């Protein structure tokens, strides 16, 4: 009887977790709203966008930690520069609107997971990515304001 109760409780916890934190096959899209057009673009560019994640992690975290994590996740980045190049490929292939939505998703998904200081550093790095990739400054936001997270 105790075993049944434990198994039933575990099953409910797993079901509740999956309902609360819906996951896509790739990125954790969390509860961030993204247009279907941008969702498609993110999915199509997911391998390269993962390199954006790795680039930012390498920049704000200890390089050895990020390198080990990169190997485990198979991102294929040997350096910050190689991650940035892969990231730029995705950003150049996506509409500006979708790059903006993706950036917002990235920040929203990290809130509560990492410290405030790391969030600020990550936001700074995200804002710099378009210029590092040779793209014009993104105009994100409903009123044409510069991108603000």
UniProtKB/Swiss-Prot annotation:
Gene Ontology biological-process annotations: shoot system development
UniProt signal peptide = 1-22
Q: Which residue stretches belong to region IgE-binding? A: 121-128
Would the keyword Signal be found if you checked this record's keyword annotation?
Answer: yes
Q: What is the effect of changing residue 77 to S?
A: Decreased IgE-binding activity
Any idea which GO molecular function terms this record carries? IgE binding; nutrient reservoir activity
- Any idea which UniProt keywords this protein has? Allergen, Disulfide bond, IgE-binding protein, Seed storage protein, Signal, Storage protein
Name of the protein this chain belongs to: 2S seed storage albumin protein
Please name the source species: Fagopyrum esculentum
């Amino acid at each position: 009887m105790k075993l049944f109760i434990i198994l039933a409780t575990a099953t409910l916890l797993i079901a509740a977790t999956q309902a609360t934190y819906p996951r896509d096959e790739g990125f954790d899209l969390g509860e961030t709203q993204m247009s279907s057009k941008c969702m498609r673009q993110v999915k199509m560019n997911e391998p390269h966008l993962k390199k954006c994640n790795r680039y930012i992690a390498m920049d704000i975290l200890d390089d050895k930690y990020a390198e080990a994590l990169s190997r485990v996740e198979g991102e294929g980045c040997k350096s910050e520069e190689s991650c940035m190049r892969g990231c730029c490929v995705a950003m150049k292939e996506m509409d500006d609107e979708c790059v903006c939505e993706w950036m917002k998703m990235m920040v929203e998904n990290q809130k509560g997971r990492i410290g405030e200081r790391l969030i600020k550093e990550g936001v700074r790095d995200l804002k710099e990515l378009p210029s590092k990739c040779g793209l014009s400054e993104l105009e994100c936001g409903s009123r044409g304001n510069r991108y603000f997270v």
